[in-house]
Regions:
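ER/secretory pathway lumenal C-terminal domains and tails of membrane proteins involved
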Residues: 1-306
Length: 306
């Protein structure tokens, strides 16, 4: 459709925001796009609501590929792309490792990190057997900021977590443990330091009976966040107000709280006390901090607290 502007410029115009792509259920089962056991989940069509007021060439290309492919070949979106690049197809994603496959099964992800339904057999085989992880775990290889950031963007650790959670829900505990172990083996902490994306590994390890692994990871995260808090409390007040420092402090405190909750629930009281003591060493009211008087209790001249 053509649209003529007030300046007599002729533009291509799509007179709708809603587009759909028909689904031949028999075909997608026959060619393996959807497993027979999931036949009842197949939708009649993909319904997409286009956002914004214009489509660029790459977006038109995506729509054209989906329309003309007619479920003949697999179509994927890269996992590291931003939500705006997914054009509304994310509710039809299936996470298969480093990419999302478009499948005619609708899910409703709550956030960016939950995009893509999981077929545990496919994802497990990909990340455990088919993928080659290269030399990330080789101590001789330098993982600089660029590589570290790329690994974070690609959400590999979170992919392993989601796989393990799905396997645990399906009662496949040994495979769930293997998936978590594989994550820490291929993306080891000595190469790619622990970050807060590993937080949910801990309760899962506990629930799977891997207490020692959960404790080790909990302590690693606790030390990391303790060091962040200790650094922040070494700053002058005017520096604390700059940038995202106060937000970083809040985040680290929240992580510590979650860790203590997980550890206590698992009955690991000694570790919980050890972590509490680390944090208390920063906020201890008897160790008056020159720049943070608001966190101190009043201390009289005799040394007793009031």
């Amino acid at each position: 459709t053509k649209l003529k502007t007030t300046s007599d410029e002729v533009l291509d115009y799509i007179p709708t925001r809603n587009v759909y792509f028909p689904v031949d259920s028999a075909k997608v089962i026959a060619n393996g796009t959807v497993k027979a056991k999931d036949a009842d989940k197949i939708v009649k069509q993909l319904d997409i609501n286009l956002k914004g007021n214009a489509l660029n060439k790459s977006q038109l290309m995506v729509l054209d590929i989906l329309a003309t492919n007619n479920w003949e070949r697999p179509i994927y979106f890269g996992i590291g792309m931003g939500p705006d690049s997914y054009m509304g197809f994310e509710k039809y994603f299936q996470l298969e490792g480093a990419a999302y496959r478009v499948v005619p099964i609708e899910t409703n992800p709550e956030n960016y990190y939950d995009y893509g339904r999981i077929d545990s057999d496919i994802l497990y085989d990909n990340v455990m057997n088919k993928f080659e992880w290269g030399n990330i775990k080789d101590p001789k290889v330098n993982i600089d900021y660029f590589h570290d950031n790329t690994i974070a963007v690609m959400k590999y650790r979170y992919t392993f977590l989601r796989l393990a959670e799905t396997l645990a829900q399906e009662g496949k505990n040994e495979q769930a443990i293997a998936a978590l172990d594989k994550s820490l083996e291929e993306i080891p902490l000595y190469q790619v330091p622990a970050d807060n994306s590993l937080l949910n590994y801990i309760p899962l390890y506990y629930n799977l009976g891997e207490t020692e692994k959960a404790n080790a990871l909990a302590k690693e995260l606790a030390v990391n966040n303790y060091q962040t808090l200790k650094y922040i409390h070494s700053l002058a007040p005017e520096d604390v107000q700059r940038g995202d420092i106060m937000q970083d402090e809040k985040l680290s405190m929240n992580v510590i709280r979650f860790l203590l909750a997980y550890i206590t629930q698992a009955g690991q009281t000694e570790l919980a006390q050890e972590i509490s003591n680390m944090v208390e060493s920063i906020y201890n009211p008897t160790a008056v901090h020159p720049y943070r008087p608001e966190v101190q209790k009043k201390i009289d001249t005799s040394g007793s607290q009031s």
